[in-house]
């Protein structure tokens, strides 16, 4: 029985809010039109090559592209003034870029929530100017259709990061475990955050196994990486496997890789990795020292794939 619908919400770059579909739809005078496109699987193109006399071709990889979504909204109003106000509010919720004058500026956020999968978000910017479609003056009819085209530079739908951590309760050295998992369909680029002072040793295991049965294994099943000794003035360190970020940096964003003797982190967490305990340890620290593991949750679709 089909007894629930997806809820589609917009959190504007100006702080505004609109519910476009689902419970509460149209309360702000705007609701989702029909035939939205680009919401489903993330855009992927595969790369193939063939030699001069090869029959067929050989797979060489894939490229994940930015996501373009095309949709329309119906803007309503009970009077000419109300329609203009709703139309203006909707337009101000969007921009082509993050406001360069606002230190807290942000992109527009689209959220789709389903009962099974919960909320998943995209960060969006306009890729071209919004259009307008109406046979008559909307100030007379109280209704107009606005086609929209927007781009998500990060094409994966995302949820709040999963957090786990460990804290040194006493003494200057100790060891413990943190729990890691990746229930999504995408490789996970984790982030470690450690306190200072201290010298931390963090896991960087390789993984093997079928989906839902991944375990540390393969070439480096017990590999660890020792971070450089951190002084209190450095304020701690972040290890970020996102290739667009500094891999190891202190709280002042100073690159620490030059102090690591040529060692760095190698391994992503594969899709559908079950909960697994990972070892962490520290020396030369103080009671209360701790480590936090941030686990991003990225999905290629707005629902499903668990």
Which residues does each PLM region occupy?
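Oligomerization/assembly interface segments of phage tail-like spikes and tubes
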Residues: 50, 54-84, 141-156, 278
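Polar/acidic, low-complexity leader/linker segments enriched in S/T/G and N/D
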Residues: 1-48
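Solvent-exposed loop and beta-edge segments used for protein-protein assembly and interaction
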Residues: 63-67, 102-104, 140-144, 184-186, ...
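Long, hydrophobic/aromatic-enriched structural stretches that serve as scaffold segments
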Residues: 62-122
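Short beta-strand and beta-hairpin "edge-sheet" elements
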Residues: 104-157, 298
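Intrinsically disordered, low-complexity segments enriched in serine, threonine, and glycine
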Residues: 160-306
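Short, solvent-exposed beta-alpha or beta-beta edge segments that form flexible loop/patches at the rim
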Residues: 33-70, 131-136
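Short polybasic amphipathic segments
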Residues: 3-11, 108-110, 201-207, 246-248
